[in-house]
Amino acid sequence: MSSASVTAFEKEHLWMYLQALGFEPGPATIACGKIVSHTHLGVNMFDKLNRDAFHIISYFLFQVLDQSLTKEVFKFCWPPFDQKSDTEFRKHCCEWIKRISGECGSSFPQVVGSLFLSPGGPKFIHLMYHFARFVAMKYIKSNSKNSSHHFVETFNIKPQDLHKCIARCHFARSRFLQILQRQDCVTQKYQENAQLSVKQVRNLRSECIGLENQIKKMEPYDDHSNMEEKIQKVRSLWASVNETLMFLEKEREVVSSVLSLVNQYALDGTNVAINIPRLLLDKIEKQMFQLHIGNVYEAGKLNLLTVIQLLNEVLKVMKYERCQADQARLTVDLHYLEKETKFQKERLSDLKHMRYRIKDDLTTIRHSVVEKQGEWHKKWKEFLGLSPFSLIKGWTPSVDLLPPMSPLSFDPASEEVYAKSILCQYPASLPDAHKQHNQENGCRGDSDTLGALHDLANSPASFLSQSVSSSDRNSVTVLEKDTKMGTPKEKNEAISKKIPEFEVENSPLSDVAKNTESSAFGGSLPAKKSDPFQKEQDHLVEEVARAVLSDSPQLSEGKEIKLEELIDSLGSNPFLTRNQIPRTPENLITEIRSSWRKAIEMEENRTKEPIQMDAEHREVLPESLPVLHNQREFSMADFLLETTVSDFGQSHLTEEKVISDCECVPQKHVLTSHIDEPPTQNQSDLLNKKVICKQDLECLAFTKLSETSRMETFSPAVGNRIDVMGGSEEEFMKILDHLEVSCNKPSTNKTMLWNSFQISSGISSKSFKDNDFGILHETLPEEVGHLSFNSSSSSEANFKLEPNSPMHGGTLLEDVVGGRQTTPESDFNLQALRSRYEALKKSLSKKREESYLSNSQTPERHKPELSPTPQNVQTDDTLNFLDTCDLHTEHIKPSLRTSIGERKRSLSPLIKFSPVEQRLRTTIACSLGELPNLKEEDILNKSLDAKEPPSDLTR
């Protein structure tokens, strides 16, 4: 290979190495302090002597090799401007290249100082070529990442095979060309983007210049001459606007008020009321010294700053609560919701179906109600002759049927609604308890002085735990409780009504009664308004009572009035419209006489039977029915005895009438005082009343036996009563338990009499006796409002009695009381009665302990009766009265199973009367072995001899 070709190869590769190392001729020339136009750089730069190129190329290669060392070595000679710096520069270059030649060895050419004096020619090109090649390998070795030692060594090894060298050269050239092509591609794209960017910048600048020109054109000219005119014009326009607003101010206020625009944006807080929750208030109070919050209202105005602070605290609390709630977020259970939705839909469909069924059933029920109501009205019309509601309507508006109720509401009623209600139109009158108590004490004081006759006639033995020393105190308690039934005026009216006409005329009893009334009650009660209807009614009732109680000839002297006519006149009173049914049937007299005569015959037959104490009759309840039959018989006998004894003396008669009338005569104001009685009744009084009533019922046999021993000639029914009672003492104990249970059971098969509530005030509701009433109790009520609507299909049981009822064992009132005209046979013997009395006394003393146990061991179902609650006291005193009336009907005989015809043929309840009630209410208890006073018996016998002829006594 010729030297010329080698030199050309080295020159070309030298320039390529320089370009590969990043040599740039322009900046390198400026950094050397040379002029670019005077410096010659390129492939042929060292063909001739070129010191500037030598300085620039050599300094660049040294700087690429080690920049810090280059600055330190050429610190004082770079750039070379003079000869000295040039010489020093050449010296340092020669030394550094010699060290490189020593490192490379034989592969690097020999370094001679003369080469640097004239930098040019083939030798210098050969040296610079190897120097550039060494720097390139160092650069590749230090800066290339994936360069290997083998790749670097290939440049240092001298080629042994020319073909291998040419192949390696071609391979390296191809790779180098690829790299250059990539760089060229990137450069071209960069230049294109640069050209586009330059064009865009130019366009934007041109647009900016155009917009600036437009702004300059739009800016107004600064014409100072017209400025003042414009200001004056604006001021005049503003003044005209203000004048228009002032002129339309009122119209604007009206429009604003209509559109609710007044004070729409006012923030003064005058009409704002802030309610701070308790949670926020507690938190602020705890942090009062940290928050420094002022008052919400200052000088009557709202403090907006405090409100804003409170709102901030509220936001903090809400944020805290939200953070607490977000920790456990709610999970939506779609399966559960779908299941619940399906269940609710099914339930809704079932409810709709049920509603349709109810609508269908409602029509049937309404038709049934209409039919039953028609049957009920028809039934009432058959027995009463008219509809029961006609008795109420038009009589007292307060008891009229109320209109249908309005839908239930929990809102309080207005005053207008309350003013229109029945409760406001007819208010309840509450009596004064103290005045009533004083009146009762006054009445009790008059009756205490007349107790001798009742001590003889009413002295039952006590089967309960009562000692002889406490008998007087207990009897006084009975009188105090049982005489709370009416006003003194009513008692005196009862006295005047019950005394027969011949006794009033022939004895000074009426004067005594009048004096007692005028002295005790003359000034205590207000004058009552005279009612002609009431006076006439009282007169007719008095006439009927006299006709029943006695057959005195004085009634027929100049007065040929039949009992039927008197009773019919009650229904055909000229003062009375026929809104009320006649209370007494037309065949009253025939029923009374037929039933009482049969009862007398049964009494005579039963008196001949001996006393029997059968164990089976004492244990089985149905076997004890004759006891209750004789109970009613005995009540009729007592009634006869009482009316007969009334003839014995003035003092005795006065006492008898006062006490009996306090209990039995119908009173006008008893009902009101009974209903208005306060419910806070003393429970101990009720307990004593019930215990004493039980004593009276159990001791009835002994009491009537003692009476019979003195007055056996008065009535044949007394002896029979003693016989029966002597053999059924234990049966009375069992019946007592059944009666207690039945008194507490509400009977739906009862209909209250017109005067039931009036009589209930004078008769103990806990007394299990024969509560039948006589003709004296029959009256037309003043207050219809206390009628009972608890009637059912069997409600006529109280109006009619069966032929087998206990009244068949009673005694005919007319035949016994009017014994002066008829003389039935008597088989009684005083000695036989006394022997029976002794036997009965022994039998009762044996059973005394059993009676203690039976009365003390009260069943659990009877215990609530001994301690009634205050709420039930009033109801028991009123309603148990009817229950005791129907005890015989419900528990002794199958009255509800009898036919309607049998009930019509039986005795009317209007003539049922039980003086046993009167006697037991005012009884003064005595011990079991105490006998009646013989002196009192003699007094009775003497008075009897004075009043009655011997023929009457033998009857």
From Swiss-Prot:
Keyword entries, A-Z: Cell cycle, Cell division, Coiled coil, Cytoplasm, Cytoskeleton, Microtubule, Mitosis, Phosphoprotein
Family: Belongs to the HAUS6 family.
Top-rank taxon, per record: Eukaryota
Quaternary structure note: Component of the HAUS augmin-like complex. The complex interacts with the gamma-tubulin ring complex and this interaction is required for spindle assembly. Interacts with PLK1, NEDD1 and gamma-tubulin. Interacts with EML3 (phosphorylated at 'Thr-881').
Coiled-coil annotated residue ranges, if any: 188-219
Biased composition (Basic and acidic residues): 479-495
Function: Contributes to mitotic spindle assembly, maintenance of centrosome integrity and completion of cytokinesis as part of the HAUS augmin-like complex. Promotes the nucleation of microtubules from the spindle through recruitment of NEDD1 and gamma-tubulin.
Modified residues (Phosphoserine): 406, 507, 524, 530, 550, 552, 715, 728, 742, 805, 908, 914, 943
Gene Ontology CC: centrosome; cytosol; HAUS complex; mitotic spindle microtubule
PTM comment: Phosphorylated during mitosis.
GO MF annotation terms: microtubule binding
Annotated organism of origin: Homo sapiens
Identification of the protein by name: HAUS augmin-like complex subunit 6
Residue span of region Disordered: 474-495, 789-814, 848-876
Record localization: Cytoplasm, Cytoskeleton; Cytoplasm, Cytoskeleton, Spindle; Cytoplasm, Cytoskeleton, Microtubule organizing center, Centrosome
GO BP field: cell division; centrosome cycle; microtubule cytoskeleton organization; regulation of microtubule nucleation; spindle assembly
In-chain residues carrying the UniProt-annotated modification Phosphothreonine: 584, 823
